[in-house]
Amino acid sequence: MEAKAIGKTIRIAPRKVRLVVDLIRGKNVKEAQAILMFTPRGASPVIAKVLDSAIANATHNLNLNPENLFVKEVWANESITMKRMLPRAKGSGHLIRKRTSHITVVVAERE
């Protein structure tokens, strides 16, 4: 059995999120939470929140034991890109892209 949680339209670029996501893939849930707690990246608290949600889904909906859970799959996909204008010289403007992410965490019980 596996449980899934998705964080949609998170205001961090997917490239930055993937750096942290790669650290917890395949790890035990408690170990993954410890890694996220001590990783000094802006994406760490957001990923920890999605991981906690996946653990809660597993324990509440599927009655799985949280001690036996591990991070089966985790990935970050590109979401919408908000576009903003930055005024420049002579009436021109440059485009600022504010990228967002969808973060998906799948936890499963180890056999």
From Swiss-Prot:
Keyword flag Mitochondrion: no
Quaternary structure and interacting proteins, as annotated: Part of the 50S ribosomal subunit.
A Pfam family annotated for this UniProt entry: Ribosomal_L22
Record InterPro entries: Ribosomal_uL22, Ribosomal_uL22_bac/chlpt-type, Ribosomal_uL22_bac/org-type, Ribosomal_uL22_CS, Ribosomal_uL22_sf
Organism lineage string: Bacteria, Bacillati, Mycoplasmatota, Mollicutes, Acholeplasmatales
Protein name as it appears in the record: Large ribosomal subunit protein uL22
Function: This protein binds specifically to 23S rRNA; its binding is stimulated by other ribosomal proteins, e.g. L4, L17, and L20. It is important during the early stages of 50S assembly. It makes multiple contacts with different domains of the 23S rRNA in the assembled 50S subunit and ribosome. The globular domain of the protein is located near the polypeptide exit tunnel on the outside of the subunit, while an extended beta-hairpin is found that lines the wall of the exit tunnel in the center of the 70S ribosome.
GO biological-process terms attached to the record: translation
Domain of life from the UniProt record: Bacteria
GO CC, alphabetical: cytosolic large ribosomal subunit
This protein's encoding gene: rplV
Alphabetized UniProt keyword annotations: Ribonucleoprotein, Ribosomal protein, RNA-binding, rRNA-binding
Family from the record: Belongs to the universal ribosomal protein uL22 family.
Tagged with keyword rRNA-binding: yes
HAMAP family per record: Ribosomal_uL22_B
Single GO molecular function: rRNA binding
